[in-house]
């Protein structure tokens, strides 16, 4: 296993002493597998969202409910994973921690927000949501996010929250601060960027409080009955809450809402049981696959290590493929989903391999 592999989706990497240990690398392989599963779900979610918002999107109610179920848990998992190694990194000093998140979060956030938004602006009516203003959006990037890059913006903010709270009172202070900001965001109107960061802060804090070692021990020693039971409970919770989603939100209906509207339903407080159980099930599956050591596990682990390039570029590949298929071949709807997911994962990996060969990955924020 490469000691320079991209260990976490954003800026989170295991400390170098841990990376040099084969035993430790084996123990944390499930984290990369979880990240691999998670980034595939992210790509699938955005591919489904593009179909929902595109021509004929209202004719696929099953896809809408699948999108709703997916959005209840897949991003909270990434915030949890992002917190697992934070304490070790904080112990190396504030300056090193801040420098790392500036390089691995802030720089890619601005660079790829500008690249992607510029292409969207240039595409005009070919995209699902054309934009008319350019510079106003670019100038506002420090406080108003575009597309999927809200995750990097939110992760940067929760890292700052974690840094401040941890220096004050350790893990308990981080948990308390995260719960506090989430409660405030629930009752005090704020900007979308701040609300997204506050809403996901507890998952990050939970990962930070548990740490990768405790998490690995829990999943390594979990009984088969508990694994299966958690999965069944997650399935029941997601089915129940998704079936009642229209009653949870007066202004939106799953079968008519846009993808962003469905996402707002998925992120409602009432969906918390589905969020926790769905996320736990994903992690349990990742742990079981990592322990099996099969080809699927190895593939997912590799994808997990390269999840940052996939995250940064998948929308460009998905949108480009969908536009090409719709306008050239007149193919639209859910039948495009497998192709979009394959291109959304595979395209960025090809770009990453090419930039590695020419030594451009670092300057593009891909490593």
Task: Please tell me what each predicted stretch does.
Residues 2-367:
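Alpha-helical transmembrane segments and their immediate juxtamembrane cytosolic regions
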